[in-house]
Amino acid sequence: MEEFEKPKPIPAYYCCYLLRSTVRHASLYIGSTPNPIRRLPQHNGVAKGGAKRTARDKLRPWEMTLVVEGFTSRVGALQFEWAWQHPERSRHLDSDDDLDSKPQAKANANADAKTGKPKSKPRARTRRSLMAHLEDLHSLLRSTYFSSWPLRVRFFCADVYRVWRAWNDRVDSRLPDMIKVILDGDNLATAPDTNQRDGHAPVGNINNLSIDYTRLEDHLEKSMFMLDDPDDLQCTVCKESISPNEEQIVVCPHPNCRGTSHLLCLSTKFLDATNETDLLVPTQGTCPSCGNTVQWVTMMRELSLRNRAEKEARAILRKKEKRVRKESAAMEGSSVPRSSSTEPRSLLEEPTQDDLGPNWFEEVDIESDSDVEGRQKHRSTQPPSKLEIVIEDSDWDDAELIE
């Protein structure tokens, strides 16, 4: 019998990014990764890996001017990356709106006056400018396929955001409400003060991005605690009892809410509350229990981790418990001297076999085709990873480098 690979949880983080050479600003590179904190040093030659087209010393160092984050799968990020790299070949940029915003593309779509047949497209030139890439990004985010995805554009360079803003003010079509723009990095001096949560707040620089499941700890802990004893729980929509072992159950992420629902019940309720009849998956909705707005992707990320990686989910909670105890002990120790014999037991215990390392979610990432030999040596001396959560960064052979 054919064995099927067990489905993996939704990745904690995946993004597409636009690199720019700090030496020559006209040199640009588009890529994708589950870990931009690690990826940027690779492009700059500080760590092994990176891409062949960013390996020239005369163009280093590179900077990440912006990231498009919020992808719920590696496949989705790769689709977006390819379309951004090859706008002239992407079916997502063939809509009438996109043709209106690109006069040359609109002219190419006209029929030949003599034969009546559509004119053949001339061989596309490489799109070289920063403005061109931002135009394509804007069009992709407005496209039918990507406009309902929970994506965020995070700008780290103020001059790049100014170019984006100039184009955004010129184009007639606006970004969907689902797409968020976050001012970060150099933009913080002029960015409005914000206390946004769920990854919408500025972080200052690439190294401060939250790329693991830490932000899901409280939600995951509450869900697993409640669903371990579901006898008194019922669906907030249909009011029937729930059975976590047999049904897909979602839990409201808000801290003080105990709302639990059948997956299909809540998705139907959220979809019925919208005016978009073509929408198959909800983007957000109002929790029937607490009345707060809930992002659908937040619940799906927690549900997939709880159902598809229960062992690892419990290890995450053990790590949180140990961290909290250690922090509490440190706070007590700062005011009252403590001997080693009075340390909490959890601090003296050796980690269990099930405990996860700090980078467990990325242990199987493949960085680049330029580091195949190094990876093979590394794998020969390291035990296999316990869970393949995300896979490799993208490094297309024909990835676009603009010079």
Curated annotation (Swiss-Prot):
BP-aspect Gene Ontology terms: double-strand break repair via homologous recombination
Broad EC category: hydrolase
Stretches with biased composition (Basic residues): 116-126
Keywords noted in UniProt: DNA damage, DNA recombination, DNA repair, Endonuclease, Hydrolase, Metal-binding, Nuclease, Nucleus, Zinc, Zinc-finger
Ranges of residues in domain GIY-YIG: 12-94
Record's GO cellular component terms: Slx1-Slx4 complex
Cofactor(s) this protein requires: a divalent metal cation
EC number, UniProt record: 3.1.-.-
Main localization of the protein described in the UniProt heading: nucleus
UniProt biased composition (Acidic residues): 362-371, 390-403
Annotated localization: Nucleus
GO terms assigned for molecular function: 5'-flap endonuclease activity; crossover junction DNA endonuclease activity; zinc ion binding
Subunit and interaction comment: Forms a heterodimer with slx4.
Function, as annotated: Catalytic subunit of the slx1-slx4 structure-specific endonuclease that resolves DNA secondary structures generated during DNA repair and recombination. Has endonuclease activity towards branched DNA substrates, introducing single-strand cuts in duplex DNA close to junctions with ss-DNA.
Name of the protein in its database record: Structure-specific endonuclease subunit slx1
Gene name in the database record: slx1
